[in-house]
Amino acid sequence: MRVVLFTGKGGVGKTTVAAATTARAAALGRKALVVSTDPAHSLADALGTELGDEPVEVDGGMHAAQVDTQRAFERSWRAVQRYLLAVLDAGGLDPVDAAELTVLPGAEEVLALLAVRDAARSGRFDLVCVDCAPTAETLRLLRLPELLRWWLDRLLPAERRVARALLTRVRSVPMPDATVFEAVQRLQGELADVRALLTEPGTSSVRLVLTPEAVVVAEARRTLTALSLHGYQVDGVVANRVFPAGGDAWRRRWVTAQQAQLEAVRQSFPGLPLWQAAYAGGEPVGVGALAEFGADVYGSADPAGEVPHVPALSVQRTVDGFALSLALPHATHRDATLSRSGDDLVVGVGADRRLLTLPSALRRCVVEGARLDGAGPDARLVVRFAPDPDLWMRS
């Protein structure tokens, strides 16, 4: 079973490549599904057919779906939202403002990931391809499982007795009933399951789609850094709209410029396959055209092949304590940051942040120092820990 998420800068052809990969896998005898989590939902246009919330077979072995996030949101969050509205109403807040405040940030997007999880766990498919939104939205989407779990933990404590102790001090605040707690606990569990699936070694990976242009390649490098920071593995790069050699002077200039960028891709993503799609005379619309496009892209390669697992994060024992190592390809000393917050390590690259919950041994240590080893695609953050004498003997 494989899950492959496709993302890249807007307009590079993510939807076409995701659908073509699915069509190619189906042509090779796999049961394959392509799911759109992009609010623009151009997948139906690429396939030339109407799609709904449930997977439908569009050709032999190939299935497709477009997630109705609004309906999924109402099923999963309505009970909690009703309770929050009652709390805010008891506090005298205007109903319109209260309704705005009870919208869980990013809920609709992450519920699209729950649909992906359900399809992957169903046992019906050998491959699930996910047509994601452009890069910035996809990165936000992939951060959401961890972010929302943090948000929910603070919205309603995990233990009912804690919530009851707090809320009963204020008589005007309604006490949440079992339905509310069950909804929150269910969503917390589902978020953890989504995160586990999408970071599962050998099962899930991200495939970057780009065009051989300097600005697009630069964004792809930043995307690799962000995905590595949050624990997601990239399994390859698809370069779309590559000009074939030959032609007039105008095309030869384009070929020269693109070849320079393709070499930059090889240097920026060493060890990863680089598949290329030639600039076609028209859009591949329909399953037949997409399957042909996919065959041209992947050739004899398996579009759903196994991904060698390269651990992004590791902890090793040292002479003086421990060393935590995190792959951060293309990060620099200028944009990498590090801080400690209780049991969490806050790692940043530029404006991006991730809270890494430390394992038990490291929670009883102090951070002695950190450095960024290597450069370019080989950059890694190494954090040194030493046992805290006041805590280390406790167990």
Residue ranges of each PLM-predicted region?
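C-terminal lobe/tail of nucleotide-utilizing enzymes
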Residues: 166, 192-333, 344-346, 350-362, ...
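Short C-terminal beta-strand
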Residues: 382-384
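Short, solvent-exposed amphipathic alpha-helical segments in soluble enzyme
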Residues: 50-51, 146, 223-228, 341-342
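Nucleotide-state-sensitive switch-loop elements of NTP-binding domains
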Residues: 1-12, 16-192
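Generic beta-strand structural signal
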Residues: 315-317, 340-341, 371-376
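Short, surface-exposed loop/turn motifs with a glycine/proline- and acidic-biased composition
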Residues: 362-379
